[in-house]
Amino acid sequence: MDRKGFVTLPGQETVWSMAPGRTAAIKLLNEQTDQCVMAFEEVAPAGTATPLHLHHDSDEMMFVLSGEFSFKIGDELSTGGPGTCAFMPRDIPHAWKNSGTEVGRAFFMYAPGEAGKVFEEMRRMQRPAATMSDPEVALLFRRYGWEIVGPPPF
């Protein structure tokens, strides 16, 4: 790939509905960055939570833009609002939850971008994880180096 810089302006993102009220505005697709990084802004209704999971091939970063989020990274539990930044290294079980009472927004990055391809594939399939069976989700996640290791820990 001939690497070039580029700018994604508001409104130019690829927007995907992950679940009712939960959207991802994909700012950087994995293939646009020569697999270096994948980035998106997520809108998460109150109570939205991920299962305890890990990524074998990528590190994850989450920056809270609005709302209040709780994090479990390894054995540590934390909660923070706007300006909070969480780093979730590869092979460390982690999860997050919008623990506030309002819709929250967060910016995510995966580096390298391989782990983010799971979202790109679900978007192309038009099948959010919430509409898939547990074995389907596990197979898709495994394909991109993810592993679900437990339910949401909150």
What role is predicted for each listed range?
Residues 28-30, 50-56, 97-99:
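Short histidine-centered beta-strand/loop micro-motifs
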Residues 7-9, 15, 75-93:
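Short acidic-glycine-tyrosine-enriched beta hairpin
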Residues 26, 39-43, 61, 77, ...:
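Conserved hydrophobic/aromatic beta-strand scaffold that supports enzyme active sites
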Residues 105, 116-128:
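A hydrophobic, small-residue-rich beta->alpha segment in the mid-to-C-terminal subdomain
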